[in-house]
């Protein structure tokens, strides 16, 4: 049908140096631009070009303006429908619908028919998302979590025994007793101490002054606002107070007097 014969002028003529009236190449030019003086000119007839001598039954259908420049076929866009003028951000159709290929430069129909592997749809990610939501909000049902959440528990850095410890219901009001989780958390507080208390030294309970002690200290303050060490020692022994308590009381009493004086001065100005 479309087999090319070796006896055609395009093949035999180039070997036997047969002149053809329809040759259009420069006959005396070498490929590198030089000229051979000793050899006779060799011409390549138009029939030697395989794309120009293809029978009409094997040639693809081309538009009228596609053949130009002495029989050379120009690449053209072949599409079954009109050209799609969609913007780059349009996502109404698949990407393959907006592509057009030239028949000479494109790949075979088998390669063009292959579709690019697409990403996994969002529906396949729904079980994993549901598992994460169940593990995030369902604290009482950790044992009933989906397999996706079980894999998350298995991937914890300190989870050799964490999987077995979380089979039962989790109570947030109690301290964690799991041995596998204890290594990942802070050291637990001693039993009986509240969560807000520090494990260090307990704060000393405040001992309020009695009315008799306050009266004695007020009388001494009226005599002298600043007390020396000897007088402070006498007051602490007589009132059954420590030296630090007497010192702090005098400091607070001086600050209270200063605030009262400043308030009176402010009221006098206005």
Swiss-Prot record:
Q: Name one GO molecular function term.
A: DNA-binding transcription factor activity, RNA polymerase II-specific
Q: Give the region (Disordered) as residue ranges.
A: 102-122
Keyword rRNA processing included in the entry's annotation: no
**Annotation: DNA-binding region:** 202-261
Pfam families from the UniProt entry: Homeodomain
Main localization category:
nucleus
| Alphabetical UniProt keywords | Developmental protein, DNA-binding, Homeobox, Nucleus, Transcription, Transcription regulation
Which Gene Ontology cellular component annotation is one that this UniProt entry carries?
Answer: transcription regulator complex
Q: Does Transcription regulation show up as a keyword for this record?
A: yes
Q: Name one GO biological process term.
A: embryonic digit morphogenesis
Concerning InterPro entries, the annotation shows: HD, HD_metazoa, Homeobox_CS, Homeodomain-like_sf
Name its cellular compartments.
Answer: Nucleus
**Record function comment:** Sequence-specific transcription factor which is part of a developmental regulatory system that provides cells with specific positional identities on the anterior-posterior axis.
The text of the family note is: Belongs to the Abd-B homeobox family.
The protein depicted here goes by the name Homeobox protein Hox-D12
Q: Which organism is it from?
A: Homo sapiens (Human)
């Amino acid at each position: 049908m479309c087999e090319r014969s070796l006896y055609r002028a395009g093949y035999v003529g180039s070997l036997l140096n047969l002149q053809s009236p329809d040759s259009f190449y420069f006959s005396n030019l070498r490929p590198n631009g030089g000229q051979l003086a000793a050899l006779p000119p060799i011409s390549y007839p138009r029939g030697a070009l395989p794309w120009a001598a293809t029978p009409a039954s094997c040639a693809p259908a081309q538009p009228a303006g596609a053949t130009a420049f002495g029989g050379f076929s120009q690449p053209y866009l072949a599409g079954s429908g009109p050209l799609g003028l969609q913007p780059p951000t349009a996502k109404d159709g698949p990407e393959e619908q907006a592509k057009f290929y030239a028949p000479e430069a494109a790949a075979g129909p088998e390669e063009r028919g292959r579709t690019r592997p697409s990403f996994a749809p969002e529906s396949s990610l729904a079980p994993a998302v549901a598992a994460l939501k169940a593990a995030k909000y369902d604290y009482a049902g950790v044992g009933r979590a989906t397999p996706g959440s079980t894999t998350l528990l298995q991937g914890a850095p300190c989870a050799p025994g964490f999987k077995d410890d979380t089979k039962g219901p989790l109570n947030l009001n109690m301290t964690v007793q799991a041995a596998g989780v204890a290594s990942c958390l802070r050291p637990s507080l001693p039993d009986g101490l509240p969560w807000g208390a520090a494990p260090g030294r307990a704060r000393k309970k405040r001992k309020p002054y009695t009315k008799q002690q306050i009266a004695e200290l007020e009388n001494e303050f009226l005599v002298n606002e600043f007390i020396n060490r000897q007088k402070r020692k006498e007051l602490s022994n007589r009132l059954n107070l420590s030296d630090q308590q007497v010192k702090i009381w005098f400091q607070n009493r001086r600050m209270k007097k200063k605030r009262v004086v400043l308030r009176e001065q402010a009221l006098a100005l206005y």
